[in-house]
Amino acid sequence: MLPRGVAGLSCCNQILEPIHPVMIGTIGKLLILISMVAGILSGLTFLRSSRLDDRVLEWKRIGRYSWGVLTVGTLASFGLLMYLNVTHAFEYAYVYENTSLALPLDYLVAASWAGQEGSFLLWIVMNSLVGVAVMKFAREYESPVMAVIALCQVFLITMIAGLQIGSIPIGASPFATLVEKFPTAPMIQAGIIPTDGQGLNDLLQNYWMVIHPPILFSGFASMIVPFAFAVTALWKRRYTEWVRPALPWSLFAVLALGVGIALGGYWAYITLNFGGYWAWDPVENSSLVPWLIGIAAVHTMIVQKRSGHSHKAALFLTILAYILVVYSTFLTRSGILGDISVHSFVDLGLYNQLLLWILTMAILGFGLFFLRMNELPKPTHEPEVLSREFMIFLGAMILTAVALVVLLGTSTPIMGRLFRDSPSTVPIAFYNKWSLPLTIIFLFLAGLGQLFWWNKMNVETVNKVLFRPIVLASISTIAVFFLTPFRLRAAEAAAFADTGGDALNQAGMFASLMDTWSQHGPYLLMLILVFVAFFALYGNGEVMWKIARGNLRLAGGAASHIGFAVMVLGIVASSGLSNPIGRNGAQIGDSRENFILALGETRVEQGYQITYSGHGVDEEGLPTYLLDFVDPNGHEFEMAPVAYESNRGQWIQNPDLKTYFDKDIFVAVSPSVMFGTQNDSGQITIARGDSSIVGDNEYIIEFVEFDLEVDEEFLGDSTEVAVGANLRLTHIASGETRQMSPVYIIRSDRSVDYVQNTLTEWDITVAFTGMNVDSGSINLAIQGVAMAPEDWLVVQAYEKPFISLVWIGFIFLSLGFALSVYRRSVDLRIAGKRTAA
């Protein structure tokens, strides 16, 4: 028996030589060890040179040369790993597990960071390049800042060192051979090299996943620089000057990390079948939290630089941002998430190393902070409430609160493991419930902050600057309420909470106030969110118009706020107003609906005429299912979503999109073969209380009632909604009756699961695949009786109104950060020239 991950080694035609002729793996391991030693030497010599004795330049020179050796070593080792991937060196475990002969060149290159060891190596390379830039631009801060960066770099390199000290393993090498990784596998011990690899995960074979990790890791790597400046400021007692050189790095870090997060969201939207771009997955959140804290830190740094306030907040948040980067790495790579997240890596035994890294960074950063806290400058007066610095500071605190809410929800797997020995996640409703009101406050402050002046404003001036944005925002919000489906959706939600939702919201019967809030509260908050988004849009738009005519590089803040406001409007439109195309499918207190379509069948759903016309193949050779659409205006188009079972036994369902400016049509399918159907199988729709004859007049199936008390063994921690269907199956000839209770489950990431029931004595299997709450009907997939066409699809189709605003908003947000990076870099260069003069 081969260990897990080594299946498929039977097709082999090469025998390992006692010593590999190329020795690439040995060279790669050696380069990593040399880089680690160089990192230690660089850190020690930079630490020594920061003492300002007569040998400063000599020690600094050694530190620079050592960092140069580290950089060359990491780049060379990364290049060797790419070479092994491209040349199909399947004797190496990393190459075997992440590549195959069928992969094109771009995916072979991307495989270099698809696995855990390779992504660590990519991060190390980014850190090395960041260090080179710091040595060039940090000036008098170079030595202490580089000492901190070197410490972090050494921790990272130990993750891929591949050493064994006694019984303690230190890291997992990307250059480990199959023999080294699976020493007990008999076929490997026989010296057999596989002729092909397991290949890259099919979900990762996407253009956006080729560029997403390098950008994300450049953000992670850049986050170390402001952290190092903050530690240096506390270490050297330079509590004020550190902000100017650190601010461009902070802005670049949140820019890169934000773009990386956005690309990941776009990948999820066009690749996964849950119909969205953010599922509040713990690993997604673990990147979001340091980004939010990083943005909050940027705002407090600006306040400190401009007004002399917020020294403590700027230092604390800057330190916290990087510690959360390390914490996100711990969540992703320690194995603590297990199967909770689709993004988590396989556990490589790095738990203790990652925990030590977090503790070291926390002790270094927060230890110095609390040690020096009483020495930090105190402002001579508190900022006026009606001032820009107060609004920016308050906005940073609200953003921090949002991040802490997400952090709390993200950390529940750790708390579950500590207190229940059972990691679990919180439902999506937790994040929405707490983040929505906080986002409303933050957006309102984002509008106020740019309109207010520094220092004090009087009430008359405030009224003057707020009048136009408030009037325009009010008009726009009223238009949204009356001219879009917003009012209809709010009414539908209230009706559901008042009728169909009684079983799900029984607590509301005991308090009329809670009843009213449960019916109208969420959409009222969403309407307020729309208002403050328009307010921030118009307020910052007015500021940007005035600034851009004079000096465009000063418009970064306004552009970022405009982008965030537009993005929020896009989120509200595409999520709150998402329109499921289909009313004969599943709607369980959720916007998710689906319907079943047989080959050649035509249905009319929400004004769309939809025909399942056949099968096809896309440009990458993947199987597609062809759906012919005629929209309500008579326009014809074809959708070709992908669905197939990968060689890893995983079903891949890539949606197809029809994109317009004002909406997207999103379609994903689950083919009948997913449910194990054969020729003696099919599907029916049946209403509560009705019965249907199935098979060749052999059985009667009756839908008795819904079952809202589903056995907990079927649920799991990620269950959002679970509904069972109590069925009575009667054998017509004998009169014998059996009970069945298949279950329909919606997970917290909006994916759907089906708990099938099988009657082994009759060899009949039933799956509950969808439902319509309004009509009380359900969809059943039945196997074991001849009853329906064998080729059918479960179709998930949605209109996503104005989802383009999400992407347009993030582009504006990123452009604003880019303008700010440019502005602060120019300011730093000018200040450096003045100092030199």
Predicted segments with their positions:
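Cysteine-centered motifs
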Residues: 11-12
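Solvent-exposed, non-transmembrane regions of integral membrane proteins
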Residues: 19-837
